[in-house]
């Protein structure tokens, strides 16, 4: 399943206690369904410093999948850590993680393509007002957030739209595109 907006994630199938937020355009694996809630696994990497609250999509790439509350990020029943390695570029230690949490069955799609199509259209529409927008693969995944933030003051986007467009740009950056840079 793929999220289409920021969604609260919970410790249990009652939604009584929030564990954090799932970011837009994030893929999760369904483990179990119970009433209005679905238990999902969020796979990714986190920096192995501090509380490791932000789960990133790939090793060394700042493409946020979810942000956990401190209590959830340090709970062994929620987060399982695996392989550890150091990012040669930054010297920061990272670890592979899987977080098991619950979400409400809403704002989720079975396919990422409609999300990318809407994000691409929003990028083309909003980011060509002042200038010709750079090709998605012109920057790498970690450069796009800074470039994108610099342009946000000139457009009127809500938080979910901003996050969707940024993730679209990162997932179509030079790190993921064929034949660029």
Model-derived regions, located:
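N-terminal intrinsically disordered, low-complexity, charge/repeat-rich segments that act as generic
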Residues: 123, 145-149, 160-165
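Gly/Gly-Pro-rich "capping" loops immediately C-terminal to redox-active cysteine motifs
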Residues: 132-155
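The canonical Cys-X-X-Cys-His
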Residues: 123-134, 165, 169
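Short, flexible, mixed-charge glycine/proline-rich loop motifs
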Residues: 117-121
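C-terminal capping alpha-helices of c-type cytochrome domains
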Residues: 155-181
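Boundary regions of SH3-family modules and the immediately adjacent low-complexity/disordered segments
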Residues: 13, 41-115
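Beta-loop motif signature
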Residues: 1-36
